[in-house]
Amino acid sequence: MSEIQKEEQETQMFRYKDAFLPIEERVNDLLSHMTLREKVGQLNQRLYGFRAYERKGDEITLTKETIEEAKYFGGLGVVYGLYRADPWSAKTTENGLSKEYAIKGYNLLQRCCLEHSRLGIPLLLSSECPHGHQALDGYLLPVNLAAGATFDPKLYKEAVSVCAHQLKQMGVNLSLVSALDVARDPRWGRTEECFGEDPYLCSCFAKAAVEGTQSEGVAMVAKHFCAQGETTGGVNASAARIGERELREIHLPAAKACCEAGVKGVMAAYNEIDGVYCHMNHHLLTEILRDEFGFDGIVMADGVALDRLQEAVGDEPHAAALALSAGVDVSLWDNVFPVSYTHLTLPTT
């Protein structure tokens, strides 16, 4: 049997491989072939991409942890920050993926994923883009507070599209962009991620960010949803002590503008609103975001937010169930989904 005949036979067996079929039909067929472990693997964004490899001179190798993760889950759903370089990641021009090594590193990781994916599911790559691409040789922009001070969302959109063009060339699928936070307390250490304190101005720039990013074929994940700038005492991730009126008048307009612009992703915020953590807030993530605003993309958790949720509710399976039921689709740096899978599959004696 020739290779072409093999491919045709495989396409007939696995309808999701038929590019001429509607996407929804292909997705449903793919899901029907997946095991529970493979499904959990697709929701799992546990790996730090900048720790997924080691570079010594011109040689790049994947870490044992990365390979084992791909083996166990039959591939990798989403990998965060492959190109990230800053003091936290400890990546520099000496050991990071600067432009001459970027594609080599990406291909190595993607090949590992595909080799261990029984169904040939490629990974998605997400990158931090608070003001341009947070990477070696990444295109950078002024921080949002400075961009907002220009009062020129059209110019900002053009600048963002240039950054997105580079992201596309580097294989990035999801650009994580701070676009939803409103400056409410200058003591908050992340105020520079806000476009300003005016909901209308923030909405205009949020819309520009979506249009600029997605014009280049890169999906944008707008963050953080919602009211993260409404901190108590300026403390990051603290409770937002607001009611429904302030939520809707101040903090939701930017999210609504993003949804109207067709944003593909939204990241939930660390904080709680009126005593309910955003990551388990069904009213926020489903009733408002999806039902009211018409959002039909993915909701991503913020970093280790589901692990923090586990600390609040008692155990991993409970945290996973609350997050998934509320509307969270993909984790970030968490152990909640993998640990919950282990609990679900333990033999009962």
Question: Model-derived features: where do they sit?
Answer:
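Glycoside hydrolase catalytic-domain context in secreted enzymes
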Residues: 2-344
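A short, hydrophobic C-terminal helix/tail in secreted or cell-surface proteins
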Residues: 345-349
